[in-house]
């Protein structure tokens, strides 16, 4: 799959995923396990790479992050405008 990088970012939700994960007191490993229950094949290392902005996030992964973290998609995407500055 071709890697798309937007303004030097592989994803635009890394900070928000980490913020909500920590706020909910969920470890990266626990988040990965919750994602796997939903059928998304990610492990703790993948969560770490996503949070460090080293890995892209697919649309179905984004939907599952929202479910696992109990947030709406617009909450994860709310700072999108800052990537245009």
Model-inferred region functions:
Residues 1-24:
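A short, Lys/Arg-rich alpha-helix, primarily the initiator
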Residues 16, 27, 58-61, 72:
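Residues that mark the N-terminal boundary/hinge immediately upstream of a DNA-recognition element
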Residues 13, 24, 40, 55-58:
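Flexible coil/turn residues that form the inter-helical turn or adjacent wing/linker of helix-turn-helix
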Residues 52-64:
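Short, basic-rich loop-to-helix N-cap that marks the start of a DNA-contacting helix
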Residues 2-7, 30, 67, 74-85:
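Short, charged recognition helix plus adjacent turn
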């Amino acid at each position: 799959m071709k890697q798309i990088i937007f303004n030097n970012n592989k994803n635009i939700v890394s900070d928000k995923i980490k913020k909500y994960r920590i706020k909910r007191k969920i470890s990266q490993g626990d988040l990965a396990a919750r994602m796997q229950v939903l059928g998304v094949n990610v492990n703790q290392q993948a969560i770490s790479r996503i949070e460090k902005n080293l890995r892209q996030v697919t649309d179905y992964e984004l939907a599952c992050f929202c479910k696992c973290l109990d947030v709406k998609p617009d909450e994860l995407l709310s700072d999108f405008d800052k990537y245009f500055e």
